């Protein structure tokens, strides 16, 4: 029996609204996403804020490092830069505020801890404590490119669900993720799926696969055929449509192969 690939909205429905904002997460809910992916960093005064970059330059009208601003100061910036059309102003929000928005929805929440550049002290403890206080332990996945952070989450809470993010080539990545990092899921960049026997290795080690970032329809079809557990995409409405087509038989494996072949020729 075919299983449906879940659709997680990357930084919310970031193809349509300013990334990592309440507007983007609300749109993901409205588009029927199964989950959302978001990024967390710490302000100077210790607030967990939802933002991808270590600086505010790309996504706002401000400039500087997140770690150097208090929450009151960083909140003055306009975070609409990734989608100024239709969004005169967009705010940066705390993780707690995003949790409050998503708690009634039942959506899965993937929290990526951004500890690769700035080594935020005790951010793992802070995120776990907030998740527990909000009663969301069963719905939250924790991921990071910093594999020490992934290990630390497990040390603090062995029941926490963790994903190992990576994009560069790793020798035996699934064995490394399972046996060294101790992650529950692999979070590979899309192109990592081309490694020989990748899905078979994940199944052998009992690891889920949550792949990022899948924005083109031909690759959405490909990951559905591969029965990836979740695709992380900026366009959750498109992902949901294609995942549903694959499950109901509209999108057959034969058709997927034809589409992939046409894509290579184009």
Model-derived regions: residue spans:
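Phosphate-group recognition and catalysis centered on beta-loop-alpha active-site segments
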Residues: 1-266
């Amino acid at each position: 029996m075919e299983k449906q690939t879940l659709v997680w909205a990357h930084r919310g429905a970031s193809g349509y609204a300013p990334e990592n904002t309440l507007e983007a997460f609300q749109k993901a809910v409205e588009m029927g996403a199964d989950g959302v992916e978001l990024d967390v960093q710490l302000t100077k005064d210790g607030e967990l804020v939802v933002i991808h970059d270590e600086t505010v330059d790309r996504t706002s009208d401000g400039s500087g490092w997140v770690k150097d601003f208090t929450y009151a100061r960083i909140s003055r910036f306009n975070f609409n830069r990734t989608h100024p059309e239709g969004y005169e102003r967009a705010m940066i929000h705390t993780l707690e505020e995003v949790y409050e928005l998503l708690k009634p929805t039942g959506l899965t929440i993937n929290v990526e801890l951004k500890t690769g550049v700035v080594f935020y002290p005790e951010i793992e403890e802070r995120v776990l404590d907030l998740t527990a206080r909000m009663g969301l332990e069963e719905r939250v996945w924790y991921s990071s490119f910093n594999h020490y952070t992934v290990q630390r989450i497990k040390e603090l809470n062995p029941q926490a669900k963790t994903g190992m993010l990576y994009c560069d080539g790793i020798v035996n990545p699934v064995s490394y993720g399972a046996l060294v990092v101790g992650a529950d899921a692999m979070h590979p960049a899309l192109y990592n799926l081309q490694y020989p026997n990748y899905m078979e290795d994940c199944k052998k080690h009992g690891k889920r696969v949550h792949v990022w970032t899948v924005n083109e329809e031909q690759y959405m079809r490909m990951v559905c055929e591969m029965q990836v557990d979740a695709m992380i995409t900026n366009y959750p409405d498109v992902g949901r449509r294609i995942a549903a087509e694959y499950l109901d038989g509209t999108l057959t494996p034969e058709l997927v192969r034809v589409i992939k072949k046409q894509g290579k020729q184009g």
